[in-house]
């Protein structure tokens, strides 16, 4: 398995799987730091801090819960904390608050400029006009086939 460095460290701590990490980060999650977590706790007694596993290990350690986007959504839904900070891309809190109006969200706002490039009009354009095609060589396609098929099978 080959994934980014911070996520690799988290997955390795949760499993017995050997992880081969590549030197990469998520620019949103890597901006968070342990001091910020402690400062938020000082200003907001009783707050629950939930972190995405792509955050640096010290941020995950300082948090109350670490999990995937789905795991974070489930945490809020199932625990209904009075106040929560989601250590992830800031629009995630907006989306989850709609379904959890009784939960107060503290939003450290780190935006992902790449995620913001994906819009419904652009997706519609791709579907209607078949734009944005990605062309790969046969060798790359064959190497990617097995993991892509495994991911698709998980969703079935």
Question: Which sequence ranges carry the predicted segments?
Answer:
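Short glycine-rich phosphate-binding loop at a beta-alpha junction
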Residues: 48, 84-85
């Amino acid at each position: 398995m080959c994934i980014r460095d911070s996520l690799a460290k988290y997955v390795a701590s949760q499993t017995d799987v050997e992880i081969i990490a590549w030197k990469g980060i998520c620019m949103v999650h890597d901006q968070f730091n342990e001091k910020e977590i402690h400062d938020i706790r000082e200003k907001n007694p009783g707050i629950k801090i939930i972190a995405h596993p792509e955050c640096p290990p010290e941020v995950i350690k300082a948090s109350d819960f670490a999990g995937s986007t789905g795991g974070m959504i489930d945490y809020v839904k199932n625990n209904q904390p009075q106040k929560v900070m989601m250590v992830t891309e800031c629009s995630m809190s907006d989306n989850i608050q709609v379904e959890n109006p009784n939960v107060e969200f503290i939003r450290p706002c780190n935006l992902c400029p790449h995620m913001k490039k994906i819009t419904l009009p652009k997706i519609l354009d791709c579907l209607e006009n078949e734009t944005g095609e990605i062309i790969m060589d046969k060798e790359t396609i064959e190497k990617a086939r097995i993991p892509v098929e495994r991911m698709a099978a998980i969703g079935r």
